[in-house]
Amino acid sequence: MLDFLKRFFGSSQERTLKKFQKLVDKVNLYDEMLAPLSDEELRNKTGELKKRYQEGESLDDMLPEAYAVVKNVCRRLTGTPVEVSGYHQNWDMVPYDVQVLGAIAMHKGFITEMQTGEGKTLTAVMPLYLNALTGKPVHLVTVNDYLAQRDCEWVGSILRWLGLTTGVLISGSPLEKRKEIYRCDVVYGTASEFGFDYLRDNSIATSVDEQVGRGFYFAIIDEVDSILIDEARTPLIISGPGEKHNPVYFELKDKVAELVQLQRELCNQLALEARRGLEHFLDMDILPKDKKVIEGISEFCRSLWLVSKGMPLNRVLRRVREHPDLRAMIDKWDTYYHAEQNKEESIEKLSQLYIIVDEHNNDFELTDRGMQQWVEKAGGSAEDFVMIDMGHEYALIDSDESLSPTDKINRKIAVSEEDTQRKARAHGLRQLLRAHLLMERDVDYIVRNDQIVIIDEHTGRPQPGRRFSEGLHQAIESKEHVTIRKESQTFATITLQNFFRLYEKLAGMTGTAITESKEFKEIYNLYVLQVPTFKTCLRIDHNDEFYMTEREKYHAIVNEIARIHKDGNPILIGTESVEVSEKLSRILKQNRIEHTVLNAKNHAQEAEIIAAAGKLGAVTVATNMAGRGTDIKLDEEAVVVGGLHVIGTSRHQSRRIDRQLRGRCARLGDPGAAKFFLSFEDRLMRLFASPKLNALIRHFRPPEGEAMSDPMFNKLIETAQKRVEARNYTIRKHTLEYDDVMNKQRQTIYAFRNEVLRSEDIFALAKESINHVALMIASLIMSREHPAGHSLPILEEWMNYSFPLQLNIEELRRLPSLDAIAEKVADELTGAFQNKFSSMVEEITAAAGNDVDANGICKDIIRSVMIMHIDEQWKIHLVDMDLLRSEVGLRTVGQKDPLLEFKHESFLLFESLIRDIRIAIVKHLFRLELTMTREQRPQNVIPVVATSFQNDENFGPMELTIISDSDDE
């Protein structure tokens, strides 16, 4: 029935395209009408359209004419020179109908999926122009500084011709320059630049003059799937150096390395023993049918199953798994030990290991033997694995009648400090083990200039300045014997998911979005529209070729490269990691095939390598760096011989990454072909392939070196990828649910901070805080289960300790209610502050004369104090929230929902934050002392309460570090 309705009415995509096509026809009609206008008359259209918008005409109504203006300008500029990145090139682009259609979709808030070479950059100019007519902030978000600069110079020339201003945010631009850029009609920049400016404005700026942004109206995100999905879990963090090094990493690194080495030796021994027993059978296509022989083989496979739980990448294990029958036996033991009735036997078997490694979930677990080894041989402590039950310990202290109240407080402080130390030690141990067991050099990171540089798993690009969180980066630094740097302290943070939700209107463009359409809809309320290509795609997509072993796969890849290379076709070989790219490079050198390598280690030569990749006979080995945002242009000879051939050495866990790699060839009607080579030892196959696929391997194993190739295998691979994508989507959604809690708190604090910065009557805000604190403290003390008279001395003692204020106890006793007492205390405190403020004004006037604005100076002092304590308490709150987030998962043991627990406890923490901010502000305001001489200039009395910031090459795009002037680094 649904299929019938779809055939009758068309799919939602078809209906949307049909509706937008009518608007395209209107644009073309206006384009013809604008042709007779002079250049000056066409330029004046911008002012005319702006005026019509201000008079109430909607952007939707003006769209056909505005888009026609842009199209007409593009046609008029054909052949004129444009300087892009220091090079002169002639303008040669006029939007096709499909580009106009994509531009309409973007204005309507769609994500447009346009194939490589279809002109996404030009398409974006039309909605940018239309929305800039409002005078509100319009941003084009790119994936790197180079593209932002290029697009601003290149297609931004159209906007400038029409009288609009354009600017580009480049990392490291000074404050005044950034303010000037944000005043432009259209601003180009990366997600991190826009995001960090938002965080700076709301957490670092100490005056309105230091804030650069002017709001969030409309944004178009280029490579939107990369930014909103691949980077979704990576928060933007402004941080500064911590107060001190965490000594745990220095103390434990050698001990952890020793424990991991013991595990490695144990697994190697088990694997070699199994290898000796199976040596005779490895070259047999079919195993013997003898029952006793099979039982013996099965026992050796049981040992290898144990090795797979301790060292999943053990070489002997991988060699044995090349045999389909032996692989099936190992998998059979895995199924056996996963059965509920065999759990005890599984635990007993796994207890032989020191550490159990769960490669599928990227996790690990110390066994009892591992813990015992840690305590006895590695010099660790049993207390590393036992956390203190704080509630129980506090209850014991409270019930100990031999302790005085002061002793009880001191004992609780000591217990709390011991708990903190144990948690820090246990956390450091866990991160060091993770660094050794799960993080691979040249896969997850590279070592460069005594630093650990993260490799982006989706793009293959190095990420200098970005650091793994929660101490993992320091653990890797200790593993690789590079300088262990200080832990950073977070000043401000936001995820890209919540940052882009700040915009009133959002749109995007990419070559691969349809596979993630569900996530775009549910998380961002964005629909995906696939825009037809201008020319038919001539790419030949071959079926994947499957090989039993990695060795056979690489042999086939080299043969394929040699065969294609003979004809002169340029070849792009995509690899999943730096390690694989270097391995393949060595194999090609052995076969005397000239080639170029592009990976995270030589990314500086990227532009040069990509420029040559489309030439006749070129062979380029690249990581995912070449899979997105690169436009490989063919020379004429390469087109004649059949265009670029893309070879994938494995399937990525995301279908989008594979589609991006395929999309490097056959752009804009050029010829090309793509083929992927896989082995059953690939990570995707090992961890996520279905049992059905393993059964097929056993029954249809071809002779060694021959490939299996069938659309059925492609379907099974796609199923595995969908399974991984679904899991990753769940993780991202889960992360967002937690971050949404933090986001509401962030918005509240930033709103309060901006109110303090912008308020013309800061004195009233200060008095409001004083009133809140007085009412809160008085009500808290007076609401105890004592007669009111008993609580009044405590209230008097607290007020005398915290503020220079003497209470009249007898007057308070005569008041009729607790509320009346609280209000009286608040009035007294507010009056005392009024007197202090007046005396400060008099002191400054006496010291500096009547020519200075003493009242304004005092207000600036109050503003600075309030901002300082908002920032300090917010930083502490961020640490508390991180700790809560890391611990709340354990609540599942008590049959509690961690998310609900997190929401509840984070609310309590936030209430505590608001209270602590107000108390800190009020105490500081009452303790302000002015020390001046008549020679001092009045502006010197304003305290400096914020650190300066730098953004240099040492601090990369995802974490911005704040360096105070006094820091010795």
UniProtKB/Swiss-Prot annotation:
Name recorded for this polypeptide: Protein translocase subunit SecA
Broadest EC class assigned to this enzyme: translocase
Superkingdom of source: Bacteria
Family: Belongs to the SecA family.
Keyword ATP-binding found: yes
GO BP terms in the entry: intracellular protein transmembrane transport; protein import; protein targeting; protein transport by the Sec complex
Organism: Chlamydia felis (strain Fe/C-56) (Chlamydophila felis)
GO MF term set: ATP binding; protein-exporting ATPase activity
Positions with a binding annotation for ATP: Q99, G117, E118, G119, K120, T121, D631
HAMAP family in the record: SecA (MF_01382)
SMART domains: SecA_DEAD, SecA_PP_bind
Physiological role: Part of the Sec protein translocase complex. Interacts with the SecYEG preprotein conducting channel. Has a central role in coupling the hydrolysis of ATP to the transfer of proteins into and across the cell membrane, serving as an ATP-driven molecular motor driving the stepwise translocation of polypeptide chains across the membrane.
Reaction equations catalysed: ATP + H2O + cellular proteinSide 1 = ADP + phosphate + cellular proteinSide 2
Taxonomic classification: Bacteria, Pseudomonadati, Chlamydiota, Chlamydiia, Chlamydiales
